[in-house]
A protein has these predicted regions:
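C-terminal structural segments of small proteins and small subunits
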Residues: 71-100
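Amphipathic, hydrophobic secondary-structure cores in small proteins
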Residues: 21, 29, 34-81
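Glycine-rich, flexible loop/turn motifs
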Residues: 9, 15, 43, 54, ...
Length: 107
């Protein structure tokens, strides 16, 4: 049975580059794994949490507070996964380190 009451969690974007293409892609890929309807809210603006372009349009920079809302049978599990992804900064530090290693090959 689908829950009709939305679950809501608030997160702060922590990665230095904010929600640019790579983290938004990760967010959407994660969101698409769930049946629940997922939305992001920034300063009252609500967008589809499964749309790369809609999320990019929010322009969420480092320090931005976002509400993640999910409604559906797997809403709580979806929120746990998405909140963890945002709180871990989309593992951006690992990517930066890998780019440094990769760039050194061309020196």
């Amino acid at each position: 049975m689908m829950s009709t009451k939305p679950s809501l969690r608030t997160v702060t974007v922590s990665n230095p580059q904010g929600m640019h293409a790579r983290p938004v892609d990760l967010f959407v890929k994660t969101a698409l794994q769930f049946e629940s309807k997922i939305q992001l809210v920034k300063d009252g603006e609500r967008v589809d949490g499964k749309s790369i372009l809609a999320i990019l349009a929010l322009g969420a920079q480092q320090g931005t507070q976002l509400a993640i809302e999910a409604i559906g049978s797997d809403a709580d599990i979806a929120l746990d996964a998405l909140v963890t992804l945002v709180e871990q900064g989309f593992d951006e530090e690992d990517v930066d380190q890998q780019q440094i290693v990769d760039n050194s090959k061309f020196s």
